């Protein structure tokens, strides 16, 4: 059985890569064969004309993959902007078919494939110039891949609105949602919002909370895996 998830977030910088890394390490600790993709990465480091995707490189390391970065991150852009804007500036096509070729290749190799998106659901990826106003968004990519979603959200003020809006946008496209994970991308403030938001979200949404990831001070493989197993509903994640 080939299975997997699409990891998206309520916004840019919410911690999708860290959460994806945590799930990867927990699956590996359970003895599962798991791979990862960062389908598009902007803000890549240009080293002697070669674009290096830091998120894609981290995921390859966390998953202990020996696959090419061209498979793990098939679209790499230098400017830290939305793919649509960055690709126009750099005059590089965001080739959706290229993403799917890489996706299908990796799916055949792994029992589970974790696919991390870019930004939030409504980040534009490209536009078919022959079709008036025909934009292709992250949400369309998720729909076409057919993977259930794990939503990464924040514990901080504003997360209730962002989480509900994102879940509503997924529902409108009839995209399956496995659940959400609350990620502390910064040290806990222990304010009222952080203390109350997790429970309020549980009351408001009809998909389960799969865990709360505390702030990680270091990206140590063993530490991330242990933290994930301790804080995530691993059995629910493994069971599609």
Curated annotation (Swiss-Prot):
Residues reported in the UniProt entry to bind substrate: 42
Reactions mediated catalytically: (7R,8S)-7,8-diammoniononanoate + CO2 + ATP = (4R,5S)-dethiobiotin + ADP + phosphate + 3 H(+)
GO cellular component: cytosol
Binding site for ATP: 13-18, 55, 116-119, 214-216
GO molecular function: ATP binding; dethiobiotin synthase activity; magnesium ion binding
Oligomer and partners: Homodimer.
Function: Catalyzes a mechanistically unusual reaction, the ATP-dependent insertion of CO2 between the N7 and N8 nitrogen atoms of 7,8-diaminopelargonic acid (DAPA, also called 7,8-diammoniononanoate) to form a ureido ring.
HAMAP family found in the cross-reference section: BioD
Annotated protein name in UniProt: ATP-dependent dethiobiotin synthetase BioD
Organism: Thermodesulfovibrio yellowstonii (strain ATCC 51303 / DSM 11347 / YP87)
Species lineage: Bacteria, Pseudomonadati, Nitrospirota, Thermodesulfovibrionia, Thermodesulfovibrionales
């Amino acid at each position: 059985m080939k299975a997997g998830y699409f990891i998206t977030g309520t916004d840019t910088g919410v911690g999708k890569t860290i959460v994806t890394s945590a799930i990867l390490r927990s699956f590996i600790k359970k003895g599962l064969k798991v791979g990862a993709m960062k389908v598009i990465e902007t803000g890549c480091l240009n080293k002697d004309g070669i674009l290096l995707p830091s998120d894609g490189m981290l995921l390859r390391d966390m998953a202990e993959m020996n696959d090419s970065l061209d498979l793990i991150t098939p679209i790499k852009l230098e400017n830290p902007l939305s793919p649509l804007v960055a690709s126009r500036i750099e005059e590089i096509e965001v080739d959706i078919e290229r993403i799917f070729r890489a996706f299908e290749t990796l799916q055949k190799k792994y029992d589970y494939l974790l696919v991390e998106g870019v930004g939030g659901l409504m980040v534009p990826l490209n536009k078919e110039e022959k079709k008036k106003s025909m934009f292709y968004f992250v949400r369309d990519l998720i729909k076409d891949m057919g993977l259930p979603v794990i939503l990464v959200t924040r514990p901080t003020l504003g997360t209730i609105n962002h989480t509900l809006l994102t879940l509503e946008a997924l529902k409108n496209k009839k995209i399956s949602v496995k659940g959400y994970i609350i990620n502390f991308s910064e040290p806990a403030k222990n304010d009222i919002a952080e203390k109350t938001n997790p429970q309020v979200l549980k009351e408001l949404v009809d998909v389960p909370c799969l865990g709360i990831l505390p702030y990680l001070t270091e990206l140590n493989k063993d530490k991330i895996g242990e933290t994930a197993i301790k804080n995530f509903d691993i059995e629910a994640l493994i069971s599609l």
